[in-house]
């Protein structure tokens, strides 16, 4: 049976794991790393890079390098968070045809789901390379506080990448699975997950294979990227004070600042001070300018203190919803790279009144949990029951624009709730129902999920028709809706007009685009491999020609040199078949050279044998050493 992989699709880094016997194993990528940067780059030559190769060239290609796209997924273009992001990233964020936030590269628009699919494809290839077989099914993680649109967009990304997404699982829940799989005694734990772009806090009761989420809360626009941008702003402001030049208008300089900020942030987790040194950051009429400054841990902590404090309110809300006090939490599990920051650990310790648990790898534990869930769904992992919750309330807009909740937040999923609606006017044959998700009291302050047009209602006085609408949240946290006319018993077909997202046709086109790109990538890889083989063949043939060229005729030598020249001439092209044909030709004409090499080698071996034979005829004489010292 083909394996189900677990993927942590992160804002900054992604990770893939698979069940290996009874344990989850993180798979190393082609660069030998256990995590892969969630970065996609589009070069001027039309090449597409994913992961570490994309991140490496970001400084020289800032506008063509897309990072932290998870913060855009499932969001509208006019979302205030998107507006904020537009001012911070060097790549272009544009309005998609459906009104969502998309990115534009080389005059082509890409949805965040497409960019995410490119990262997922990389993770899929990593797993396939390790397993030696095709991978078609996956469990993908999302922040617990993701809404329906963001979850659906993540599922779409999996489909575009050629994966059947068996389950969308919350990141803190996945971490709890990996942490508590071998724990038999009952415990109440809190998972504090501060990653590259999002923050989640979940409270769970675990024990004897049952993982029950009691509550969850969070902030989908708070993470390591925000800490980096705080430092970028600080560096740019200090440089402006010193040199009078604003680096915020220079995309190349901003990318260098971001790289330096990330490095400084990491270094300050283990040292009290670091030095930022960026030579030739910019130039003016007086010449090149260099940025050099020292940064202490204390200064960094003061710059990001408001970000750290923003994690406390969701923690309070999660505890309140779970009906618990901080002292009733048995263990606090830290997840996400940002939890390595000493200040974060200190704040968590102060809030919960206990040292946080550091026994799990914060970068890998989520992917491992996803792999375990994959094992559960496949039947390989027995006696594990996962009870998750919906993070946000689900409801409809009622008279006066009020948000009327049908399913409260932190309701265990899957769940179903029905509500009966009627008409507002006589002989009304259609009703429009607007479905929202969120916690605000007015509907328009929440996230519009979809608009339902119930058509074909029989003519009747207002308030008479009884239309039962059922809201259903599945195990992925994704909302489904059905409707029935109770008067006639007839099921009504609901035409869902999502407020954004991708249509089936969009996804189909993107799948085809991904497949064609996969074919292009395969062709490009074949070209590179063929060129590498050709260059190795040219090198070895030229070396042999230098050493043994005098052992073949001038005519043979001329043919070999001509074949080498022909092969070199096609190396600059993109036709691997032509390169292979020229390699074959060179191999054929070089046969006489190889023959000469073997003959020379055999002659040398025979000469050595004769010499050894001659040495065998020599008789060893006995001798006695006389120590004759003259006095």
From Swiss-Prot:
Disulfide-bond pairs as recorded: none
Keyword Coiled coil assigned: no
Induction: By stress conditions e.g. heat shock.
A molecular function (GO) term: ATP binding
A Pfam family the protein falls into: HSP70
Stored PROSITE patterns: HSP70_1 (PS00297), HSP70_2 (PS00329), HSP70_3 (PS01036)
NCBIfam families: PRK00290.1 (NF001413), PRK05183.1 (NF003520), prok_dnaK (TIGR02350)
Function: Acts as a chaperone.
Family per record: Belongs to the heat shock protein 70 family.
Protein name: Chaperone protein DnaK
Organism of origin: Bartonella bacilliformis (strain ATCC 35685 / KC583 / Herrer 020/F12,63)
